[in-house]
């Protein structure tokens, strides 16, 4: 028997996943296009936290959006980083006047999108900082700079979110 997939059409899977996420957790988050937004963001009087990445491993980063965790995630297509403009839009949306921390996984596409977004954010006058994960020791084919930093991202999300909620400054977070 041939294995079936829970996919209606490959070209709409990301949009459908995000709609489903919004329907499953309406009390925690909202979905606006390819942005997953914490319901807690509206009242945020603190440093806010944004991350981004390709879809395909849901709930992945989007599953960490919500009260006490991430504020916004920009979602790319399957295994592809979102473009820099979408990441910038996420930072702009998240900015509540105390600064925005952009958490980046160490993948080439994510690095490129983050660099573009940071350039746009600085040009717009946003107070932003970027942290790139890179702790992974299992996967290191070309040297230390290529460590993906996937596993440590979850701990980083928790630590940064806790510091932000304690009222720490952007540099402290």
Regions inferred by a protein language model and the residue ranges of each:
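Short glycine-rich or small-residue beta-strand-to-loop segments that form or flank ligand, phosphate
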Residues: 4, 47-54, 70-73, 99-108, ...
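Glycine-rich oxoanion-binding loops at beta->alpha junctions
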Residues: 57, 64-97
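N-terminal amphipathic/basic leader segments beginning at the initiator methionine
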Residues: 1-49
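A structural-propensity feature for long, helix-poor, extended segments
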Residues: 88-106, 112, 145-158
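Alpha-helix capping and helix-loop boundary segments enriched in small/acidic/polar residues
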Residues: 5-8, 56, 75-82, 105-109, ...
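Short alpha-helices
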Residues: 131-171
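Short glycine/serine/threonine-rich phosphate/pyrophosphate-binding segments
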Residues: 58-61, 85-88, 109-115, 138-141
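Gly-rich Lys/Arg/Thr-decorated short loops/hinges at beta-loop-alpha junctions or inter-strand turns
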Residues: 2, 44-52, 61-74, 137-141
């Amino acid at each position: 028997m041939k294995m079936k997939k829970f996919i209606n059409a490959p070209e709409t899977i990301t949009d459908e996943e995000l709609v489903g996420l919004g329907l499953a957790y309406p009390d925690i988050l909202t979905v606006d296009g390819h942005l997953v937004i914490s319901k807690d963001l509206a009242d945020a009087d603190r440093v806010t936290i944004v991350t981004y990445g390709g879809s395909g491993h849901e709930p992945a980063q989007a599953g960490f959006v919500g009260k006490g965790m991430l504020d916004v995630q920009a979602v790319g297509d399957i295994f592809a980083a979102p473009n820099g403009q979408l990441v910038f839009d996420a930072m702009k949306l998240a900015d509540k006047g105390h600064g925005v921390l952009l958490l980046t996984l160490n993948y080439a596409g994510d690095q490129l999108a983050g660099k573009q977004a940071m350039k746009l954010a600085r040009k717009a006058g946003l107070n932003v900082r970027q942290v790139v994960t890179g702790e992974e020791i299992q996967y290191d084919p070309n040297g230390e700079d290529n460590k993906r930093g996937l596993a440590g991202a979850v701990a980083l999300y928790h630590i940064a979110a806790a510091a932000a909620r304690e009222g720490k400054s952007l540099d402290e977070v």
